[in-house]
Amino acid sequence: MTTQKSMKFEQFNDGIVTICEIDDDGNVGTRKEKLRFTEKTVGYNRYYEAMTAKVQIDKLIRVPHRNWLTTEYLAVIGSDVYEIHQVQTLSETLPKTTALSLHLTRQRRLNNGKF
């Protein structure tokens, strides 16, 4: 007998993240796409596992799934620039969702301080 997985409907109502390419100087380059997101809590285990790997996770968000979305992009929320440290596809949600582990960076910046 097969059982059906329960699907969770994901809402993206916490804000908008802009996914951008990285320019030649390592800063925010060409805007790829704006996506709505929902923010999740960075759990105790995830936080300390990241710290033991010498990676700091400042924010965990979920966005609608995009096949092209990798760690080769930057995420901009408001005026804050984040490096994408992990991209994880969640198939048990409707619609299909991608979880992004983000690190707030102070070395990277917006070109001319704005979009």
Report each predicted region and the residues it spans.
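Short, conserved turn/kink motifs that form compact alpha/beta structural patches or helix kinks used as
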Residues: 24-115
